[in-house]
Amino acid sequence: MGKDYTFIRNWISFHFMGNINNFSYCVVNAASGNLSAYFHNSKNIGIILWANIAFGLVSRLVNTFLIENVNSKLKIVVNCLFMSIGLIGVALSVYVNFGFCIAAIAFVGIASSFGESVILSYMKKFPAELVNGWSSGTGIAGVCGSLFYIAMVAAGLSNSTIFYMMLPTVAVYFLLFFFGLKVPNHLEEDRTDNHNNSNNSSNNSKYTEKQSLVKKDQLIEDIDDGGGAEVAPPGETKKQRYIRCARLVWFNAVNLALVYFFEYVASVGGADLALKKDPNNDNFFIANAFAIFSFCYQLGVLISRSSLQFVKIKHIGVITILQGINMVFWIIQAKYKMVTSVWVLFILMVYCGLLGGASYVNVFYLILHQKNIPNEDRELCINYAALLVTVGITLAACFILVMDHTFLASEVPKTDSSSST
């Protein structure tokens, strides 16, 4: 079926917003090796990942439970402010200390997590297929971010200059949301951003209205989910609604969290120690292996996040099992260095990204698509899944810190070389 101008316009806008939303976050991850080495904290590389995601968990909680009814436009303005503070802070941190750098990275992480939570919730106003535009944008952000950092370092630019150069992306993000996106007319009437969910002690008439909303949703195809929408009963309290929605998405959301835990342990904790550190080796690919691992991982994410138009995976649990096995391999590799070819490791990191991206795009597609989730509850269900993504990455950061200070401590370089400032 051909897509009209509005659909294409929105797809492009969501794509580039997804790219920008995760761009700074991905650059920080690619730079984490150099940043931790510059501050003589290679053993604490996990703290950078933790700062980049942990405070994002708080922002997701706030967006889900405290400011659910706040206008999305205001949220985006605030998010642009967070982006700017984070980038400027990281750029200035090389003149201060590691703690200041961590605080600035926290703002970068907040902007990425909060922005994702806001935009995914906002997408309930649009056809479910547009999640592919957003997901492919977030996927390409990793490729662009890691390539950008590798190229800038190769060009001899300092970390300060690199992060200052990223500031114009914030303005583009702002313009795309306010002037690029256009809510389809046939959805605008039924799905307003100011919809007030606070009065959950609804009467029978509202119960009937909810049933009708589910029945008239023409945007999505049927998925064999074993039944129709679980419409909220009359008199449902806010707490009861939270519990009911959690039950609707718990399986897919928990699988997504596990996949993210496994892949971040592999792509950060495992990849950082996957090769023997030799200061006398001037091979570009080995010297910059961690940043290149980040690129390979993000390349895999991009490919799989852009695959929704071609293949849809309903059995999410299979991806979780494969990623768990993959994580075990990378931990063993970090300890024993079994695979000596950096090129084989690069390919295996692409595979890691493929699994992660596939889980992400298919879980959110299912949430936006499944008939058993009422339209008015999709935003909350999306926020639950996004929240558990952050939980998975936060736990991964903590696990990496434990690994680097315990059974992998002997593999961490004892001396740190300064990177460019």
From Swiss-Prot:
List where the protein spans the membrane: 13-35, 47-67, 74-96, 101-123, 137-157, 161-181, 248-268, 284-304, 313-333, 338-358, 382-402
Its principal location?
A: membrane
Query: Which membrane topology describes this protein?
Result: Multi-pass membrane protein
* SUPFAM superfamilies reported for this sequence: MFS general substrate transporter (SSF103473)
**Which cellular component appears as one GO term in the record?**
contractile vacuole
Which InterPro entries does this UniProt record tie to the protein? Battenin_disease_Cln3 (IPR003492), MFS_trans_sf (IPR036259)
Compositional bias (Low complexity) spans? 195-205
Q: What is the protein's name according to its record? A: Battenin
- Which gene holds the coding sequence for this protein? cln3
